[in-house]
């Protein structure tokens, strides 16, 4: 799947500074692109626009030539946020969080494989988000984003809040999954070392 952002501009309301100013970005099928910029330069805002969560003031995002805002049903562009507790319903059990993604795999072993790869424990699935650690919750959010029809993953500081061992485990699995499924990725991080390791190229805003 090819994703193209054309001439994206955005600011939060009148009288505020321009967050994004005529940004262009293309991600080819199966390509991994890193995004770097200082804090406050619109990295997360751009990610939300690319995933269809925000509407730009001008410009457009195309997914295989179709505007992302016109897509219906499951969006092939899925985003994992830095703070997992802000992206889940606290009143829903974690098994339901998984079901929010496109988890209708024809072969049940696919779901089990992703659970195992991310270290998701069965005994956690009946719990609520507040009953697990941040690292455990982020594993569920990543699994949710890796639905059957996901073709591009946006990882916005996906492992920043996790310890180094957990970061390594998660990135090891995600990179293997991207290669296995020929998925693309946009990764946001303040760490140039991480982006150089996990991406094909790095873009600075």
Predicted regions and their residues:
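Conserved ABC ATPase signature
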Residues: 128-132, 136
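H-loop/switch region of ABC-family ATPase nucleotide-binding domains
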Residues: 188-190
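Q-loop/switch helix immediately C-terminal to the Walker
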Residues: 83, 90-106
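ABC ATPase NBD coupling module
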Residues: 66-78, 86, 92
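A short, flexible loop at the N-terminus of ABC-type nucleotide-binding domains that lies
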Residues: 2-5, 9-22
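Helix-to-loop junction immediately C-terminal to a conserved catalytic motif
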Residues: 51
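Hydrophobic anchor residue at the start of the ABC signature
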Residues: 142, 154, 170
